[in-house]
């Protein structure tokens, strides 16, 4: 049986790992086993936080819409606003509504008055 030399493959794998972990602090960027563990942990965190970012932005949009609705001075809650939007079949998602609330409040006032009728 012939001898298999795999030093290059292992070195290439560790080099890739070292490039990934180069920005980590301390032993996390120097020791191979620690780098491996930290890489797994970093990827897990990245995966988890991609979902969290979606939830956080949705919360931010809802907060912005709610703040502008309460500024109108009318006793009109966010959930009634969204409910009336669906009843009138206006297809505006929360992201677009939040942008309108931030950049063009008069437009949101108009939308709100139209769906109240």
Curated annotation (Swiss-Prot):
One of its GO terms (biological process) is translation. Keywords: Chloroplast, Plastid, Ribonucleoprotein, Ribosomal protein, RNA-binding, rRNA-binding. The keyword Cytoplasm does not apply. GO terms for cellular component: chloroplast; ribonucleoprotein complex; ribosome. It is found in: Plastid, Chloroplast. Binds directly to 23S ribosomal RNA and is necessary for the in vitro assembly process of the 50S ribosomal subunit. It is not involved in the protein synthesizing functions of that subunit. This is Large ribosomal subunit protein bL20c. It comes from Olimarabidopsis pumila. The lineage of its organism: Eukaryota, Viridiplantae, Streptophyta, Embryophyta, Tracheophyta. The gene is rpl20.
């Amino acid at each position: 049986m012939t001898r298999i030399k795999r030093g290059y493959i292992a070195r290439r794998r560790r080099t890739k790992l070292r490039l990934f972990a180069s920005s980590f602090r301390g032993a996390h960027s120097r020791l191979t086993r620690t780098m491996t563990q930290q890489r797994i942990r970093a990827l897990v965190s990245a995966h988890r936080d991609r979902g969290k970012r979606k939830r956080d932005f949705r919360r931010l949009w809802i907060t912005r819409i709610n703040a502008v609705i309460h500024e109108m001075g009318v006793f009109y809650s966010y959930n009634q606003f969204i409910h009336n939007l669906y009843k009138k079949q206006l297809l505006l998602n929360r992201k677009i509504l939040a942008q309108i609330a931030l950049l063009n409040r008069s437009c949101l006032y108009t939308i709100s008055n139209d769906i109240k009728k």
